């Protein structure tokens, strides 16, 4: 047996299990799972949420950020933003899900904390994060809660 065949597997349980989680949580408006991911050596810990709540919150954050702009800029930005997010925030229809025609490839998180070697980013506040399932090297159910110093 060559060394290549020993290290390659057609089934990647890590990816398969995360896709199952995504298939349950992403179309949900209320479902969530505490999750910690290793993404190329960086730890990301937070609450996995559905795509619709994720995009709704991103929209609110964006609108709040542009409120200080001119009314014309705000109006155009809101219209364009709404058009884009209306298309992407809605999960696939139940028939597509039943027939297995739709595959979820991303994880959406709320209260995400990113851990590097020396600090937690962000230190405070609510952060929304999105990442590709294929980029995940490992994970566990549950969140890391940083110690207060």
Model-derived regions, located:
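Conserved RNA-binding domains used in RNP assembly and mRNA/RNA metabolism
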Residues: 2-149
